[in-house]
């Protein structure tokens, strides 16, 4: 048997420690800017054990990657909460909660439903797993107000709480089906942080949780607020809704540009055809005159 060198031994100890010490944090900040059209700037920044693992547009978070890693956890496999038991329902739940708290969707929902005058809003999700404890904390920041849900081996949370007066009734929305939030924080997210840390250790050079996006500004549709009028928390589990529907997508912009381009192209072609016809008639008259007809 080959002897372990000090370097390989250090790597071995480091990798073995992965399963026992992991800390995963993602921060989202959304800012609304009223220019000639309303724009939304949403930035997501993620850290794995304090090391940057992505910083770009919220819509560029690798949700499918996070969902696939979360599906590896025992918490996901054993999930039986809120009448969610089938694989398809549990997968839909992961898709929804990751979009809510890792891609800024919940921030847009709160602005549309409870905080119409908000120009900016931010949130943080932090999960950890070590030898002594496991758990997670979700925190929303609005002005000087902080709203928190903390669930771990030391704290058995039952509701979101605010250190302010909650004059806008934000807690009414957040505490809907709060058992799903608590289950994710206490049973899935800590193990997810461990899975993420393993991937970070295996591929330190290329690992990232967010795709690069040089254009974090997104145009919001004129109807984006009204689209949330009939929304309630976790509605998307049963109704497969598009989380990007608040934004004008590239295909629509491309289509409108293409339509305009086709209009001008058709107009130009018609003008050229008209000129050719006129030139042909003038040339024909000269030929007839020269022949003496």
UniProtKB/Swiss-Prot annotation:
Membrane topology qualifier: Single-pass membrane protein
User: Which InterPro entries does UniProt cross-reference here?
Assistant: Herpes_UL37_HHV-5-rel
* Transmembrane spans: 262-282
Q: Which residues are glycosylated?
A: 23, 55, 83, 120, 150, 156, 168, 212, 249
Which compartments does it reside in? Membrane
Keywords per UniProt: Glycoprotein, Membrane, Signal, Transmembrane, Transmembrane helix
A GO cellular component annotation here is:
membrane
Q: Which residues form the signal peptide?
A: 1-21
| Family indicated by similarity | Belongs to the herpesviridae immediate early glycoprotein family.
Q: What is this protein called?
A: Putative immediate early glycoprotein
Query: What is the native source organism of this protein?
Result: Human herpesvirus 6A (strain Uganda-1102) (HHV-6 variant A)
């Amino acid at each position: 048997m080959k002897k372990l060198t000090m370097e390989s031994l250090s790597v071995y100890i480091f990798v073995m420690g992965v399963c026992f010490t992991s800390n995963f944090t993602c921060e989202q900040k959304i800012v609304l800017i009223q220019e000639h059209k309303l724009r939304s700037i949403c930035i997501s920044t993620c850290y794995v054990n304090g090391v940057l693992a992505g910083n770009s547009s919220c819509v560029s978070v690798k949700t499918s990657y996070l969902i696939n890693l979360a599906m590896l956890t025992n918490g996901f496999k054993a999930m039986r909460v809120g009448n969610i038991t089938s694989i398809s329902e549990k997968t839909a739940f992961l898709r929804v909660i990751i979009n809510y708290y890792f891609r800024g969707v919940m921030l847009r929902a709160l602005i549309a439903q409870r905080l119409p005058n908000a120009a900016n809003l931010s949130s943080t999700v932090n999960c950890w797993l070590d030898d002594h404890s496991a758990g997670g904390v979700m925190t929303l920041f609005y002005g000087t107000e902080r709203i928190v849900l903390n669930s771990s081996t030391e704290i058995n949370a039952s509701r979101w709480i605010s250190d302010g007066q909650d004059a806008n009734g934000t807690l009414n929305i957040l505490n809907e089906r709060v058992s799903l939030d608590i289950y994710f924080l206490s049973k899935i997210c800590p193990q997810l942080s461990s899975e993420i840390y393993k991937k970070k250790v295996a591929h330190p050079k290329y690992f990232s949780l967010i795709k690069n996006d040089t254009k974090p500004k997104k145009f919001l549709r004129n109807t984006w607020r009204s689209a949330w009028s009939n929304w309630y928390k976790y509605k998307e589990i049963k109704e497969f809704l598009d989380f990007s529907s608040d934004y004008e997508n590239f295909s629509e912009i491309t289509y409108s540009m293409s339509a305009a381009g086709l209009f001008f192209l058709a107009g130009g072609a018609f003008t050229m055809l008209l000129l050719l016809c006129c030139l042909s008639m003038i040339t024909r008259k000269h030929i007839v005159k020269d022949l003496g007809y």
